[in-house]
Curated annotation (Swiss-Prot):
Organism name: Exiguobacterium sp. (strain ATCC BAA-1283 / AT1b)
Ribosomal protein among keywords: yes
InterPro entries documented for this protein: Ribosomal_uS2 (IPR001865), Ribosomal_uS2_bac/mit/plastid (IPR005706), Ribosomal_uS2_CS (IPR018130), Ribosomal_uS2_flav_dom_sf (IPR023591)
Gene3D superfamilies: Glucose-6-phosphate isomerase like protein, domain 1 (3.40.50.10490), Helix hairpin bin (1.10.287.610)
Protein name in the entry: Small ribosomal subunit protein uS2
Recorded name of the encoding gene: rpsB
GO BP annotation list: translation
GO MF entry, a single one: structural constituent of ribosome
PROSITE patterns xrefs: RIBOSOMAL_S2_1, RIBOSOMAL_S2_2
Length: 246
């Protein structure tokens, strides 16, 4: 059975592409027709592609891999954060900082600085410092949290990226390519699908469409993790039974 139904996709407006004058010819194979100057995406292909992406993400998560959710456009920001947190993964929903992947050691230093400031706030250090200094430090902490909060617990470079709108996230894609990190992405009719390993042809501007598809990728991770938990529970139960038998 498919991970997602045609009905769900239609209701979320996943089929609406961009205006016909704003298109990438490489997306032609994913286009069903044109209506009132707008391309209509072939949802049968979207269903198939969601299945492929879901299976890839689930298998990656089952092997302990990390997925970085990326969506800095307004329509994606909230969903990217919510679904990454729900699935226990990491996210970037503000500006992508150059070198986030290719220069992770430098980014890690900034993350350590953020954690240091958070600790200072928690342990009461701010209370004994001059007010002016505290204001400056809090400003720095807020800024670091804004850009790095979603990756501050990420142990290293992620094993895959999930991206909303490849045109918007060109730097992230270029960095992932340099490091051979696979990319899953919601790809609209104005994007280049050749840059993406797992293309999900869909409307990347409608909040409902972005929410539906992003939540499915989060579901794949959760399903994999639940499977791990069940395997661990079974192992504990088997061990207990073996001990009793002795």
């Amino acid at each position: 059975m498919a991970v997602i139904s045609m009905k769900q996709l239609l209701e979320a407006g996943v089929h609406f592409g961009h205006q016909t004058r704003r298109w990438n010819p490489k997306m032609a194979k994913y286009i069903f027709t044109e209506r009132n100057g707008i391309y209509i995406i072939d949802l049968q292909k979207t269903v198939k592609k969601v299945d492929e992406a879901y299976n890839f993400v689930r298998e990656l998560a089952a092997e302990g891999g990390n997925v970085l959710f990326v969506g800095t456009k307004k329509q994606a920001q909230d969903t990217i954060k919510e679904e990454a947190i729900r699935s226990g993964m990491f996210f970037i929903n503000e500006r992508w900082l150059g070198g986030t992947l290719t220069n992770f050691s430098t980014i890690k230093k900034r993350i350590n600085r953020l954690k240091q400031l958070e600790k200072m706030e928690e342990d009461g250090t701010f209370e004994v410092l001059p007010k002016k200094e505290v204001i400056i430090l809090k400003k720095e902490m807020t800024r670091l949290e804004k850009f790095l909060g979603g990756i501050k617990d990420m142990p290293g470079v992620p094993d895959a990226l999930f991206i909303v709108d490849p045109r918007k996230e060109r730097i992230a894609i270029a960095e992932a390519h340099k490091l051979n990190i696979p990319i899953v992405a919601i790809v609209d009719t104005n994007c280049d699908p050749d840059e993406i390993d797992y293309v999900i042809p869909a409307n990347d501007d409608a909040i409902r469409a972005v929410k539906l598809l992003t939540s499915k990728m989060a579901d794949a991770i959760i399903e994999a993790k639940q499977g791990e938990e069940e395997v661990a529970e079974e192992a504990v139960a088997t061990e207990a039974e073996a001990t009793e038998a002795e």
